[in-house]
Design a protein with these regions (language model features):
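Ubiquitin-like/PB1-type beta-grasp interaction modules and other compact soluble beta-rich domains
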Residues: 1-98
């Protein structure tokens, strides 16, 4: 399935892309499948979004779809139909911290 993905600016710069990217993701479309496809298409992103060994989400990285934070859902959970149909993008957000 063709999935739209948005990346934070620093990762778009690293991947040398602008705007939303599209990926061909095998079914079932899950966060894990999207990240596997993303890292395959853009190898320079390996280890930036999730740990390259454990595949755990990196601190300060969040995942959103349809206005909902999916960061704490299991990586193999199916994504909303709006994402799998291409209506809504899967968003990878670089969280902010500080005081």
């Amino acid at each position: 399935m063709i999935i739209r993905v948005t990346l934070p600016t620093h990762l778009r710069t690293l991947a040398q892309v602008t705007g939303t990217i599209t990926l061909d993701v095998p079914e079932p479309v899950t966060r894990q499948a999207i990240l596997d496809s993303l890292e395959s298409a853009y190898p320079m992103l390996r280890g930036t979004i999730r740990d390259s060994t454990s595949k755990e989400r990196r601190p300060f990285i969040r995942f959103f779809a349809c206005g909902e934070d999916l960061s704490h859902q299991p990586p193999e959970s199916p994504l909303p139909g709006e994402v799998t149909s291409g209506i809504e993008p899967f968003r990878i957000i670089g969280a902010m911290a500080g005081g």
